[in-house]
Structures are given as C-alpha cells and as structure tokens.
Amino acid sequence: MSAAHDDAQHEHTFDSVDAGASATYPMQCSALRKGGHVVIKNRPCKIVDMSTSKTGKHGHAKVHLVAIDIFTGKKLEDLCPSTHNMDVPNVKRTDYQFSYIDEDFLVLIDSNGEEKRDVKMPEGELAKRIEKLEEEGKDFFVGVQTAMGEEAAIDVKEASNKD
C-alpha cells in the first residue's frame, strides 16, 4: 500500500462542525490571557500559566506559555516573542440530550431532534457519571466541546424537571 493511499484512508471531513468558519484565528502573543485558548504544537489548549521575560539586548520580550490540551489533558509549553502572532482555536461547546450508549459511542439528540452518533464515550469519572445517570433513567445533557475538527464529551448535567 502506498503512502498516498494510506493518507487518503485517514482523511476526514468535518463539514458539520462549522462549515466556513476557520478552525483558528491569529492573536498577538502579548494579548493572550490565562484561562484563554491557544494552539501549541498543533493542539488546542487552555492557558493555565503565562509569564513575560524582559526585553533582552537581542530583541523582544518573550512570553512563556503553559497550557493544557483541552482534549488529552497533556501539559504543553511554548515560548514566543510578545509581538508574534499565535493561533487561537475556535472552541465551541454544545449541550446535547443524552439518548443511550451504543458500544463505545454516545447517541445524543441535538436541538433539531436529530441523532448525533459520533461522540466517543469518555473515560474515567465522566463515563461513570453518564452510566449512573443512564441506569437511574434520568434525563440529562452531555456537554460536547469542539475545536480544530475534534470533539469530545466534557461534562454532564441533569435536566431540570419542570412539572
């Protein structure tokens, strides 16, 4: 199998995410803020710490960024001149009504009543909460975070019963 053929099998299109919207937008490094998002090593991250070093005799002040990958939880760091632009991911969060679990995927219902079947069942504590709510027959919503063509379930919240 050729490398080109292999690549073709791994190409995915994510038209449904936000067709026409850019996955990232540029922002000057000095304008980034703790709690905001940034792309480091081609991964969407949330900034957990940042510090600025003074301008040295050879140029610009540098900004040291410490961030957590919003999908894997891995810590990433970057150092950039304060005047340079960094990419900021467009991060979107949508709540879907939970329907059921189908093997390793969540079956969710969007606001139009359409089924969404492409969100993987999360791992760890969140998976336990989803399974418990499902067992108890509760109505609940799953928060799905989307950025740079990836998406993942990030939290759950019980529906408020208005009787």
UniProtKB/Swiss-Prot annotation:
According to the UniProt record, one GO cellular component term is: cytoplasm
Q: Which domain of life is it from?
A: Eukaryota
The UniProt GO MF terms for this protein read: ribosome binding; RNA binding; translation elongation factor activity
Consult the record and explain the modifications the protein receives after translation: Lys-57 undergoes hypusination, a unique post-translational modification that consists in the addition of a butylamino group from spermidine to lysine side chain, leading to the formation of the unusual amino acid hypusine. eIF-5As are the only known proteins to undergo this modification, which is essential for their function.
Pfam families, from UniProt? Answer: eIF-5a, IF5A-like_N
Main location, first listed in the record: cytoplasm
Which cell locations does it reside in?
A: Cytoplasm
Keyword set, alphabetical order: Cytoplasm, Elongation factor, Hypusine, Protein biosynthesis, RNA-binding
GO BP, sorted A to Z? positive regulation of translational elongation; positive regulation of translational termination; translational elongation
Q: Which residues form a coiled coil?
A: none
Q: RNA-binding: present as a keyword of the record? A: yes
UniProt cross-references to InterPro entries, sorted A to Z: IF5A-like, IF5A-like_N, NA-bd_OB-fold, Rib_uL2_dom2, Trans_elong_IF5A_hypusine_site, Transl_elong_IF5A_C, Translation_prot_SH3-like_sf
Keyword Cytoplasm on this protein?
yes
According to the UniProt record, list the residues that bear Hypusine: 57
Q: What does this protein do?
A: Translation factor that promotes translation elongation and termination, particularly upon ribosome stalling at specific amino acid sequence contexts. Binds between the exit (E) and peptidyl (P) site of the ribosome and promotes rescue of stalled ribosome: specifically required for efficient translation of polyproline-containing peptides as well as other motifs that stall the ribosome. Acts as a ribosome quality control (RQC) cofactor by joining the RQC complex to facilitate peptidyl transfer during CAT tailing step.
What family does the entry list?
Belongs to the eIF-5A family.
Stated name of the protein: Eukaryotic translation initiation factor 5A
Origin organism of this chain? Neurospora crassa (strain ATCC 24698 / 74-OR23-1A / CBS 708.71 / DSM 1257 / FGSC 987)
The beginning of the lineage is: Eukaryota, Fungi, Dikarya, Ascomycota, Pezizomycotina
